[in-house]
C-alpha cells in the first residue's frame, strides 16, 4: 500500500539498536471503512476524535496512523488505513491490565476498555468488518 503516515506518538523510550529486537511488540490494525459512513466523517472520527483516546487508554509508547492512498497490487484487500501501535513491554500482548494501561487495577482496565470500544465504534463496524490485528516483533531503526 502507498500511505500517508502520521506519527501521533513517537517513542522516546524504546532503544534504537539496528538488528536488535526491543523488549516490546507492535500491533498492526488493518481498518476498513463502514459502508454506512462517508469517508470524511470516518477519517475525522478516527484521526480527530479517537487518537487521544487510544493513547490515553493503552500502554502504547508509539502510535502511527497510515491512511492508505492506494493499493500497490490488484489482489490487495480494500483496507483504508493501517495503524501501528508500539508497546514497550511484550507482556501487554497477553495481559489486558498491562495492555490497557491499568497494571493491577481492574476498575481502570474496565474503564479503559469501555472508553476504547466506545471510541472505536465511531469508525469501526465490528459486525460488518471485523478488524484484522497482527502482533509482531518490534525493531526500531533510527530514521
Indicate where each model-derived feature is located.
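Macromolecular interaction modules
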Residues: 1-143
